Amino acid sequence: KRALDIACIDYTTNPHEDFDIAHINTYGIKSIMLLFRAKRMGKKVVYHGHSTKEDFRNSFIGSNLLAPFVKKYLTFLYRHADLVITPTEYSKQLITSYGVDVPVIAISNGIDLSKYCQSPKKEQAFKNHFQVLPEQKIVMCAALYFKRKGIDDFVKVAEMMPDVRFIWFGETNLWTVPGWVRRL
């Protein structure tokens, strides 16, 4: 939304209003309904292809059993788009390898760097909240509890460096996480 506002481009987030292009960012039931509705209306569809079978695998209990079906479903969705935008060249290669024959381009998910500038006040609030000692080094990760996000390596390194504070930001219902991750 922010990019469209900055560029002074009209848009709607209401799928029942008139639009020229549908940009779909997820793969739930509402997304597939919007995809088919847009196609029936002769509208162009841009799909944000950040989900892949490879990302889905090893993520939740049972994900490896479902992964082949997820791949078929995602391939179906992406093939019905007019354009697929992925965040990385890697995901572009994966999606293209599925036989998706519409244009697939990689555009990084940019961030607003001004939101992440140094702030001594925020740094102190963070250190107080997490009870970080003065001069103590901190290693952080922001991700769900997935092997592909490196949670096992994060824990191993933390065990080897007891003088460094390791903090993992990310929350997942532990009942969906494989047992070996819960035991870390």
Predicted regions and their residues:
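Short N-terminal targeting/anchoring amphipathic segment
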Residues: 13-30, 44-46
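Conserved donor-binding/catalytic core segment of Leloir-type glycosyltransferases
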Residues: 133-149, 155-161, 167
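A short helix/loop element that forms part of the nucleotide-sugar donor recognition site in Leloir-type
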Residues: 117-132
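Carbohydrate-associated surface elements
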Residues: 90, 110
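Acceptor-binding helix/loop patch of EC 2.4 sugar-transfer enzymes
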Residues: 47-72, 114-115, 179
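Membrane-proximal helix-turn-helix segments that form the acceptor-binding/catalytic region
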Residues: 40, 65-84
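Active-site proximal beta-strand in glycosyltransferases
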Residues: 21-23, 37-56, 85, 105
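Glycosyltransferase donor-sugar binding loop
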Residues: 111, 142, 165-182
